[in-house]
């Protein structure tokens, strides 16, 4: 149905997360319609990003330098550390503009079914970082999947001897109806409740 070069492009685009066959086909056809200069600019940007973006040596977040902007920022709170599964979580938390501490990216979650144990994650550097620096609080911000819960409990137990360990509350989304929420979400929402502050 497609010429071999177009079929290869569609196949490669399908490898991207969230891109199914129809979306890959639409993207490929869109790329072919664009001017050659624009397509070359896109291809060059992809290659440059792959070559130039690595991991911060301190927190393992994406960085074009040995240390990321967040770790280098002197205005960030050095005594609070937020532990996340991957860089997408850092980006999501940064968008809230609520958190002013530093991060530690694990690089995934413990998932025995996928062959991922604690040794494959950035857990040892995290324990070293917390034990060697004056970290007053570690916030575990890992999604509440089965693997995420396993990771949260494992990391929490390792860090407990060194500092205060908390986790983010999970609950209902804004505008969500209670009747449509699952039992686990409702239970977490109740567990994470806080006293109303009228000030």
Curated annotation (Swiss-Prot):
NCBIfam families in the cross-refs: recR
Membership in a protein family: Belongs to the RecR family.
InterPro entries, per the entry: DNA_Rcmb_RecR (IPR000093), Hlx-hairpin-Hlx_DNA-bd_motif (IPR003583), Rcmb_RecR (IPR023627), Rcmb_RecR_Znf (IPR015967), TOPRIM_dom (IPR006171), TOPRIM_RecR (IPR034137)
Function: May play a role in DNA repair. It seems to be involved in an RecBC-independent recombinational process of DNA repair. It may act with RecF and RecO.
Residue span, Toprim domain: 79-173
Database matches in PANTHER family: RECOMBINATION PROTEIN RECR
GO BP: any one term: DNA repair
Signal sequence residues: none
Zn finger residue spans: C4-type: 56-71
GO molecular function: DNA binding; zinc ion binding
Alphabetic keyword roster: DNA damage, DNA recombination, DNA repair, Metal-binding, Zinc, Zinc-finger
Name recorded for this polypeptide: Recombination protein RecR
